[in-house]
Amino acid sequence: MEAVGTAPIAARLAQTTRSVEDIEHHYRIELELAERLRSAPRDERLGLYGEVYDELFRRVPNHPQLTRKVSDAERRAAVIDRVSLLRRFIDPETVFLEIGAGDGSLTLEVARHARKCYALDVSREILSGVQHPRVETVLSDGCSVPVPANSVTLAYSFQVMEHIHPEDALEQLRNLFAVIAPEGSYVCVTPNRLNGPHDVSKFYDPVARGFHLKEYTAAELEALFRRVGFSKVEAYPRFRGRYIRMPLGVIKSFEWLFGLLPYSIRKRIGRKPIIQNMLQVSLRATK
C-alpha cells in the first residue's frame, strides 16, 4: 500500500474530533478490506459484505459508527426528514420496501401510513428488533431482493448504492426492478462523487477507495436505472428543509458545470450547503 502522509488530512481535521493516528489506522484497514471486496470473484464476494464490515469494526474499535452517540431526538429528526421526501408517494395501499433498513426506524414510521412494509438488510441481527404487524423483515445477500414479484409500489434506499460493488449494484437493480409493481417507483439517495469522496478516503484521496466501492453522479445513476428498465427518472434536491421536484436535466447540467472545475476548487466549495443540496443524488425512478 502506498505511504500515507498527514498533509492531505489537515483541511479535514477541523470536521472531526479523531486524531491523525486514528484516522490513518482506519484508512489503512478499510482500504485493505475494500480491496478484498473489489477483487473477490462474484460468488465469493456476496458472502464477504457482512464479513468485512464485522472485521472493520473489530480492528477499528473507535470507528465513528461504534462511538458516535446519536440522541433519540437526532434519530427522530433524521427519520422525519426522510419521510418528508417519501410521504408524497405513500397512501394507505402502499407496499413499501426499504433496502438497507438497518434498525428499521424509517420502515416502522412508514408502516403507520402504508398497507405493508418490507425491511431488507444483509444483517439478521440488526433486523431482529424490527417488529410491527405490517412489517416483514427480509434477509438479503447484498444482491437478492426476495419479495414477491411486481408487488412493491414504493422502494427506498438511503446511502446504500455506494457500498455495493458495481457489478452487484446492477444485478441488485435488476432484482429490485422485478419486484416493483407496474407504475411503482424507487427512491434512491446517495452521495455524489463530484463533491466526494464521502468515505474515510476523503482525508487522503480524490476518489473513494474505502467501503464506498463506487460513488455516482445523478447522470450515471439515471443511466443505470434506464438500463434495467425504469421509464422515468426525476430529481428531488433539498432546499431550505424541503425536497422539491426538479427536472433531472437541471441537475445533470449543474453536475456537468461543476465537474469542469479543478479538483482543488471542487474540494473547497463542494461542502457548502447549497452545493451539497444540489449535488446530493436524490432520484425517483418509475417503472
Predicted regions and their residues:
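Short, glycine-/aromatic-enriched active-site segment of Class I SAM-dependent methyltransferases
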Residues: 188-212
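A short glycine-rich, Lys/Arg-flanked "PGG" loop and its adjoining helix->strand segment in the class I
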Residues: 170-182
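Short N-terminal helix/helix-N-cap motif within the alpha/beta-hydrolase-1
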Residues: 165-169, 198
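Short catalytic micro-motifs in class I SAM-dependent methyltransferases
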Residues: 159-163
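Short glycine-centered segments of the SAM/dcSAM-binding site in methyltransferase folds
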Residues: 95, 183-185
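Short alpha-helix
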Residues: 213-228
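A C-terminal cap/extension of S-adenosyl-L-methionine-dependent methyltransferases
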Residues: 201, 233-287
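Conserved N-terminal segment of class I S-adenosyl-L-methionine
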Residues: 1-158, 170-173, 277-281
